[in-house]
């Protein structure tokens, strides 16, 4: 199932309970599509959300609203039913907003092209925390709710851990020779996986963020521009060669290809029932892949190790991380395009705005 959006999309997200998918485009438009198992995508709504590119998009408020982040430095909340503007943080950052994720029911986190991360308190309608650990654009963020820590990756080649309880940057990795482009937490919180520009996956153990404990090189030399966690042992990668793959972590191996685009992958997202994988790329196409059909039988093999992992980590207590070097795709993509991707929110962020 696929549709030509008419322009490149840099962020996508699925509705948390119904068959709707949203896409944020390079021209600032927000598109909303309905899908089902048997027919093509049908556009339900088109909204001019931003003056510049829409870099990130997520459903919040149980799917009642869509939040978008833009190169115009703003964050916008749009009503799903009417398409009306609900709230607008016009100058959320001093630079282009590149990433946005949900943190708690009353806070979200946003990251910009200069490396600044902000935590927004929706009740106070203000920025409650600000972290400036990075020297280049924020490429990805993920939140560890049990410890109230935000894990951040950047084009400067480092990963940081921001403690929301102490309002301090608790840890930061050594500088890598390569940009860190994407991040997920796996193995029940014991491992942090980062995608890099040269295609190496870096595995950090929780609590030991200075250096990586493992590296997986089978995707090289294609930069890993998008990472999506499928479960605690498997993730989905989107690379700049247009290939989408299912990858096992510890043991590290490429399990199987999922699909492809003609151009670099920009963003990946899972439907509410995990039946469909959504993907966007630099070919203006939005594609939905039926994971139930594609992955049938792959669970049986999820314990086999093939593939090349430079270090073999037993995944005991989990505590390392590492970066590899040598390419140029996500960082340059995010900043050059003046539109990037990734937004993650599941609560009532703009409820009080």
Swiss-Prot record:
Major location (coarse): nucleus
InterPro entries documented for this protein: WD40/YVTN_repeat-like_dom_sf, WD40_repeat_CS, WD40_repeat_dom_sf, WD40_rpt, WDR55, WDR55_POC1
Any one of the GO CC terms: nucleus
WD repeats: 4-43, 49-88, 92-130, 133-172, 175-214, 218-257, 260-299
Subunit structure of this chain's protein: Interacts with DDB1A.
Key words of the record: Cytoplasm, Developmental protein, Nucleus, Repeat, WD repeat
Pfam families: WDR55 (PF24796)
Gene3D superfamilies with a match to the protein in the record: YVTN repeat-like/Quinoprotein amine dehydrogenase
Acidic residues bias spans: 310-323
Additional comment: Plants with a weak allele homozygous for WDR55 display pleiotropic phenotypes in the seedling and adult stages.
Keyword Repeat among record annotations: yes
UniProt family annotation: Belongs to the WD repeat WDR55 family.
Descriptive protein name: WD repeat-containing protein 55
Source organism (scientific name): Arabidopsis thaliana
Low complexity composition bias: residue spans: 339-353
Phylogenetic lineage: Eukaryota, Viridiplantae, Streptophyta, Embryophyta, Tracheophyta
Xref: PANTHER family: WD REPEAT-CONTAINING PROTEIN 55 (PTHR44019:SF20)
Domain of life per record: Eukaryota
GO BP terms in the entry: determination of bilateral symmetry; developmental vegetative growth; embryo development ending in seed dormancy; embryo sac development; endosperm development; polar nucleus fusion
Tagged with keyword Repeat: yes
Tissue: Highly expressed in roots. Expressed in cotyledons, leaves, buds and flowers.
Its biological purpose: Required for male and female gametogenesis, seed development, and embryo and endosperm development at early stages. Involved in the establishment of bilateral symmetry in the transition from the globular to the heart embryo stage. May act in the frame of a CRL4 complex. Required for proper vegetative growth and organization of the adult plant body. May play a role in hormonal control of plant development.
